[in-house]
């Protein structure tokens, strides 16, 4: 096999004992036929050094800037390898003596690896690092932290050094992509007490099989011509205005739109062989034809003049394609700069998708689609049935879930209001244009193109829907695309259903969402314990509140039990009858409830695999997947859950709920009883509402100081629905990786790993962007991710802040091209970037501004108290915020304390700014001045 030959050709032998005494061995003494030696000796000291034997038919270049032996004797030999016309790879042969500090990974190897990443190649690090990967000690943790943060994978799994008394795994191979690995392992030999490790590499990308898609062809689509053609049918569109039957209106609307669009952008089935190049214009195609013509002429004549002409055409084609690609990418990024998902689509279109496999099914696609649809449409019904069985198996006595729902006064009922054309236009223009279309294959791009023509009829149709309490039948059909999560793609449960709805239906949903959300906010109908789908609320604000509660408990020498509840298929199993009753109780008028009833019922879906569709099946449970209204409806469904809990606190972000309770260690026994009682109450409530609560995935985390946690009995556990739940060391909650000490070490480590992976992806295609676009892409996709919920964890250690700074430095080098040995500060200043420490301070300050000015949830705003609100004495500090008193440094890590301190230290001119936009601008100017 070619891949085996390649792998054998790339065999790399390394040895840490290639010199003896102070006189090193010569290359002739250690030569191997057909191999070239690349060596890195330890100078002026006996023993040591590494070398690599590279087969002579492989082009090998030592990266001298990266290769060195440090003062502490840490060895790094970096080599660029290229075999034939395959893309080159980089290997690093390394050795760490046992007496070299473990800091060498962070201080020496990591900077060089990050610099190697800028070369945009796959990397292998291999050698004897004297870190036993079979023993959970300090050495293993140090090496694991290193390769985890840099998205490397350690592929050797068995002992590499065996003695009479021990077995250790100290010789490792770290790879930047497991897709490269064909085979790896350890070779049994008696040459040395170190067993050789090996890896076979597959360097050629597999040829992707063709796939088919059915979509509209916009090759000859012209928005102006389409709109002009639509104007000729305005009489049919205007006839809509005299009709009040919303189903008839929609049929007419779709018929006019479809018949016109079918002419300008007909539905076609395409065979996709290669990635599309929309930027290759007809002019470039003609140049390519001329280039190929001159190449054929040279091949016939072998004339040097013909070769020169061919090269001119070839270079001209390359230049024009590169320029066209950059222009196309820039325009795409500029259009979707505020949508990170769209930006990733753009980047993934540029990067060849080597690891993505076209799904091939052993059964007929029609049969698979039918089986998948049967499974997906039964998920909600089965979850509700399982919830009922779970209650029966655990002797949970279920009662009527509607008996304790609070009913609000009838003089404050919600009624739909007619919407204006201006409001509909605003909603449509704010919607992204690149979302996948629904069953009708009409995307938002087309709706925007013809909006001046269809706006009146569309607005009338939405108003008819609201006034007649009717949701059109054609809008209740969804197309489902199965997306593989993991495992066998032919098993339906291994796939996630992506539900596609008609884009015009989402406009109507957005109108309803805006009106109903405003009503719920005005009359304060949503529980204060629900932070999802509410203005001024976010995952960050809820995380701040909960972590502050836990830090305050530690300050008071208490522990906190945090229980993260897991609801399986929560959106799918919602009972329509219960939800409609709760809508009525929360204030929706009978007419509004009737509209929601029509919206929820009578729905169906079909599954599409490639170009094959299943038959449609009815959906009897749940809120619609992929619908704009679904999160709000679910929040209303569980709105009274927090009120049922007795001794603990319960907070939610949509369907993510948590129980938590702070307690003294001496009250551990009673607290355990209280926790189990509230878990039972929560389980009973969920099961009564047909929500399947999963005890096996429920996480139990104890948070406290190290001394307090050491006093907790190791056998502590909770019993929940027949399952024993023991405390975990780490748990992920709303995107934050929590540990028992709230150190955020694990969170930062995973964050660094994720950001570095994204930067490597972007670095591979950075030549497709100009610097301005590249900066925008990195800020949107990497820096924004790095700062997610930063006000929660910005109180972490300086060591973690330094790790994040290294990510920002790498991002800066990707954009600016600054070399490893060049100082990074001027480049950061040129990009107008704050260092990470100042960046975190900026975000903390903005959150403090929001809390002081009522732009945050009440549960945060209420902690920002003016001293003048406490006493009437007129003092110099009368207008400052009251600083909360904490006994320990842990208490001072709370955002409550940090935010108040930050606010009090601000200049009065900055505090008095009334616009948050201007405040952010002025704050950034001040921090930039302080930084540089």
Place the predicted regions along the sequence by residue:
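Short, conserved micro-motifs composed of acidic
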Residues: 31, 139, 159-179, 184-185, ...
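Surface-exposed loop/turn segments and immediately adjacent short secondary-structure elements
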Residues: 200, 204-206, 229, 241-248, ...
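Conserved pre-catalytic core of RNA-dependent polymerases
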Residues: 376, 410, 414-624, 661
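Short, charged alpha-helical motifs in flexible N/C-terminal segments and linkers
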Residues: 1, 11, 276-383, 417-462, ...
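Surface polyanion/phosphate-binding segment centered on an Asp-His-Pro turn
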Residues: 5, 80-89, 119, 177-274, ...
